[in-house]
Amino acid sequence: MAEKLDFLKRWLATAIAFLFWAVAGTLLQLGLLPFAKKGKQANLSTQLKIRHFVGGIWYYFIRYLSCAGALKVTYHGFEKLGRPGQLVVVNHPSLLDVVLILSKAPSLNCIVKKDLLHNPTMRNQILACGFIPNTESLDLLDHCERVLQQESLLLFPEGTRTGWDGIVKLNRGAVSIGLR
């Protein structure tokens, strides 16, 4: 009986979290529209302020999941992140990876899957924060090189979440960016 209650509690907490994500994402979509329209013309200072704002919302989202018992997270070494020129390469086993990382280190820039620009709750967050859509081109490498002169960059070398089979397929983008 206790297991069923625990499952129900976590299921309800997760359902509320998805509702929060949808509502917060929609509100951010509207609120960040003017900044998203500026796109690449927005200055770094504005992008950093928006990243900290979005990271703060994600921080409280993670806090809710932790307090509700749906998630347990321990962070180590995050104080070392955020220096210009730093390429942060991490694996991507779950949907929440980027949220977990950027809630604790919101100044990081990030290469994101370009398909997320079609997601109605993520598009304006991505554009307003100045995140870099993965176009898998030489222009992307040049853009990353420019970004790394002033910022640190978060990169998922798998390109997407790890499959259910646990097999990791690395894309060569991390190596290409690192070598530049």
Question: What does each of the following model-derived ranges do?
Answer:
Residues 67-180:
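Soluble catalytic domains of membrane acyltransferases
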Residues 3-74, 124:
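A transmembrane-helix-recognition feature enriched in membrane-embedded lipid enzymes
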